């Protein structure tokens, strides 16, 4: 199976394979088969629209985890200029599962922080599969407090299965690190915009997710537990993950209807990984617009607005 396509996309993958075969035949024999290729491309687009217009919550969860999906550093490369990565929590070590640093957006200084997964095996291990340890969250907190001192807005990118649950993380007080970030972010006197770009897994996501504006990409997810984890608890088997995903309401559109998410950012046809540059352009445009709006608020109004937003959850 083509790794660029998930199983429910297999009909699209088959058409793309035919298109590639025709291109190779045309190159080898100098034949003009552009009309047939164009016909198949139109058919592929129509089929993609049909499949992606009827995705289940579980299919969206799998898209959010797609191995080709853009990660935080990909968005930083496309959206910002003059990015300077900063390292370490000044307590224990540096955590590669969290990246952050200063940058410019539309020529204005900002602090960018996000979860980072890896592509290849060694990189995945180095990034701990996007699951931060306490030092990652403490690094993020250090950078956010720095941003407040220098009056820089904070932009976070959320993409994690969850905080790392290992013994070493618990020994260094994982829960305290997350809780401290929630406390600090609620009081920071600078605008905060969080964008869920893939998986928004529980407290591991929320630790950089307290904000004035919460965006979610169209095929991202945000939940207190993974569908597999929920299914294992409720039905004693991960095979019920699809049912759990539907019941939990983990998708951007569902969370927007509950007023938890402020903006759903549309993805290119087939998902963000089909056109990362276009996806980044969409995110960039929204961030600029939202920063302009939040930048007009004084600190008291900003904090009151943030408090009211958080207190409105569940009402």
Curated annotation (Swiss-Prot):
Residues 39-293 form the CoA carboxyltransferase C-terminal domain. It comes from the Bacteria. Pathway: Lipid metabolism; malonyl-CoA biosynthesis; malonyl-CoA from acetyl-CoA: step 1/1. It catalyses: N(6)-carboxybiotinyl-L-lysyl-[protein] + acetyl-CoA = N(6)-biotinyl-L-lysyl-[protein] + malonyl-CoA. Disulfide bonds: none annotated. One of its GO terms (biological process) is fatty acid biosynthetic process. It is an enzyme of class 2 (transferase). Its EC number is 2.1.3.15. Keywords: ATP-binding, Cytoplasm, Fatty acid biosynthesis, Fatty acid metabolism, Lipid biosynthesis, Lipid metabolism, Nucleotide-binding, Transferase. Coiled coil: none annotated. One of its GO terms (molecular function) is carboxyl- or carbamoyltransferase activity. It is found in: Cytoplasm. Acetyl-CoA carboxylase is a heterohexamer composed of biotin carboxyl carrier protein (AccB), biotin carboxylase (AccC) and two subunits each of ACCase subunit alpha (AccA) and ACCase subunit beta (AccD). Belongs to the AccA family. PANTHER family: ACETYL-COENZYME A CARBOXYLASE CARBOXYL TRANSFERASE SUBUNIT ALPHA (PTHR42853), ACETYL-COENZYME A CARBOXYLASE CARBOXYL TRANSFERASE SUBUNIT ALPHA, CHLOROPLASTIC (PTHR42853:SF3). This is Acetyl-coenzyme A carboxylase carboxyl transferase subunit alpha. It comes from Pseudomonas entomophila (strain L48). The lineage of its organism: Bacteria, Pseudomonadati, Pseudomonadota, Gammaproteobacteria, Pseudomonadales.
């Amino acid at each position: 199976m083509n790794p660029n396509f998930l199983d429910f996309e297999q009909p699209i993958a088959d058409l793309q394979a035919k298109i590639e075969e025709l291109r190779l035949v045309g190159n080898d024999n100098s034949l003009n088969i552009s009309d047939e290729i164009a016909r198949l491309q139109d058919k592929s687009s129509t089929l993609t629209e049909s499949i992606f217009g009827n995705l289940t919550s579980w299919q969206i969860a799998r898209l959010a985890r797609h191995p080709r999906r853009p990660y935080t550093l990909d968005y930083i490369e496309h959206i910002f200029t003059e990015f300077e990565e900063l390292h370490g929590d000044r307590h224990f070590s540096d955590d590669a599962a969290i990246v952050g640093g200063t940058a410019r957006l539309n020529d204005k200084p900002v602090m960018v922080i996000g979860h980072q997964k890896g592509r290849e095996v060694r990189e995945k291990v180095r990034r701990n599969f996007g699951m931060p340890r306490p030092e990652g969250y403490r690094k993020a907190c250090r950078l956010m407090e720095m941003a407040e001192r220098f009056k820089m807005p904070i932009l976070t990118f959320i993409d994690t299965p969850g905080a790392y649950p290992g013994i070493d993380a618990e020994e260094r007080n994982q829960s305290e690190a997350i809780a401290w970030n929630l406390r600090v972010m609620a009081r920071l006197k600078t605008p905060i915009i969080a964008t869920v770009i893939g998986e928004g897994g529980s407290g591991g996501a929320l630790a950089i997710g307290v904000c004035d504006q919460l965006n979610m990409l169209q095929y991202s997810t945000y939940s207190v537990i993974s569908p597999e984890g929920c299914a294992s608890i409720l039905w004693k088997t991960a095979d019920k993950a699809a049912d759990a995903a539907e019941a939990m309401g983990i998708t951007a559109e569902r969370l927007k209807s509950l007023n938890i998410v402020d903006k759903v950012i549309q993805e290119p046809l087939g998902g963000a990984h089909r056109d990362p540059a276009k996806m980044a352009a969409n995110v960039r445009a929204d961030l600029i617009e939202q920063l302009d709006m939040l930048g007009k608020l004084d600190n008291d109004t900003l904090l009151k607005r943030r408090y009211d937003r958080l207190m409105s959850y569940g009402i």
